[in-house]
Amino acid sequence: MTADVNTNSDLVMKRELLGWLDAQRTHVAEQVRAMPAEARRRSVVPSGWTPRGLLRHLTLDVERVWFRAVMAGEEVDLPEGYAGWIASEQDSDEELLEKYADECRLATAAIGEMELDARPVWWFEDGGDPPHSSLREILLHVIVETATHAGHLDICRELVDGGQRLVLDEPTT
């Protein structure tokens, strides 16, 4: 009986964590869409990132790396160094948003049947041990990272056009 209860509670917890992650993913996409097009291509911070670059970073360095490469062990193309932060001028804003949405769907599908206690199956050859030891920890990390970057986009948007987003996110179900 205890195993069934634990498995059921893990399924509920996983669904809740994915719901919160989806809420943050939506926050990111909404803020990028809400910005004036020219503002998506320029930086307003000393580090030099742009909203388009941040979107690409979340697509490749976060969703693809953590879920498809690290957890699922898929052999996927990964950017090197800071290349994930550089959005090609060839990609339209809508294409970058579509790539982000597609990668989020692929990431969610890749971990679909995994238990929260599942261990990473891949890590960078020269990177030592993975910093997180389970899908649960990786989900929490990605939620925090995505929410942090959503906040960066909130600030960017307010600086460029004064727009503000009231953060009353609820998990998707």
Which residue ranges define each predicted feature?
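Short, contiguous alpha-helical
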Residues: 4-8, 14, 18-33, 37-84, ...
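Active-site rim elements
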Residues: 12-17, 93-97
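Acidic/histidine-rich alpha-helical segments that form the ligand environment
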Residues: 84-123, 134-147
